[in-house]
Amino acid sequence: ANGYDTFVRINGLKYDNDNNLWMTNSGKDKTEGVLNPIKILKSDGKWISLRYPEIAGLNNLERTMFDKRGNFWVISSWIADYGVFCLDTKGTLEDSSDDKHKFIKNFTNQDGTILSHNGIYCITEDKNGAIWIGTGQGPIILNNPSNFFEDDFYCTQIKVPRDDGTNLADFLLAN
């Protein structure tokens, strides 16, 4: 054994607007804690564990954020499990039956191309409410993050004109 057969990571600690402390619990040790990867320490001291099948047992749930709508975003940056998870609790932390949640591994851009990333590294929201995600293929933008849960959801890649008379463009920071 190389010493890495089991591990657990606590990461992405963030407070929500109700002063609840959220965190991720991920790792290679498929214990109950890791299979319930979102933990919340409520402001009253009570712990809540949330389980969503699409991210249960992922190795590296890291960066997190809350958007202006109160949705909780999580990046999985492990090579085999990279992707973005979004959770809308509908304001009911202790009732997950009404939650909307989705994990996207491969995004589709505005041209209908499925992006095969070699990593997802960071996430933030701009002043207009768009979500920016830093990937190994350059930034992608979720201009309407509320549509993340829809089947026909797509992201935008910024195109930089080549200015060589061909009307061709390259994606910003790709390759």
What is the role of each PLM region?
Residues 1-175:
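Carboxylate-rich, polar loop motifs that coordinate divalent cations or form catalytic acidic clusters
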